[in-house]
């Protein structure tokens, strides 16, 4: 539903690659921003993946928005087989936080596997009084569509301030 701006309705069906931290609302918001007040134009494309019978390049104004791939069935009818957003639409973000902070992106809690401890020199365990060390962590978000994802952080029940650059303070 390109003209309606509800691209999220087809993201799973056509395997559109977006971050797991993008919600349907955030995807639709980013798509609406990319197409706002711009004419959508469709042109056939010579570049098509294997198993695809026809490909279209979709532009929003002067910028490429996506490629749409079609497959022909036995009755010679075409149906969409895939959609790829242009690489320029994707953004990457880095969030810097402590290991004890709970971080959410667009309302989705960041999974432990997406958090990496920042490299630090080895510290003699005899120098630390506590058995649990709080590490500084880096969270990398790739395949994001939004210009400004909603990042929130908390430690226990206390909300933590989040800077525009993605740094969390506690």
Predicted regions and their residues:
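Short, aromatic-enriched amphipathic alpha-helices that serve as compact interaction elements
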Residues: 1-6
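Short beta-strand edge/turn micro-motifs at domain boundaries
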Residues: 57-169
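Short solvent-exposed beta->alpha transition segments
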Residues: 7-63
């Amino acid at each position: 539903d390109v003209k309606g701006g509800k691209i999220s309705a087809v993201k799973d069906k056509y395997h559109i690659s977006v971050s797991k931290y993008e919600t349907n609302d955030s995807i639709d918001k980013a798509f609406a921003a990319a197409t706002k007040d711009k004419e959508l134009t469709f042109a056939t494309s010579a570049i098509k993946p294997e198993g695809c019978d026809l490909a279209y390049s979709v532009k929003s104004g002067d910028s490429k928005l996506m490629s749409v791939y079609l497959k022909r069935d036995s009755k010679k009818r075409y149906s969409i087989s895939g959609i790829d957003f242009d690489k320029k639409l994707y953004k990457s973000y880095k969030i810097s936080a402590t290991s004890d902070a709970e971080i959410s992106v667009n309302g989705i809690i960041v999974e432990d596997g997406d958090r990496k401890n920042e490299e630090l020199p080895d510290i003699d365990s005899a120098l630390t009084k506590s058995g649990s060390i709080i590490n500084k962590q880096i969270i990398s978000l790739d395949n994001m569509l939004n210009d400004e994802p909603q990042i929130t952080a908390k430690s226990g029940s206390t909300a933590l301030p989040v800077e525009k650059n993605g740094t969390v303070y506690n």
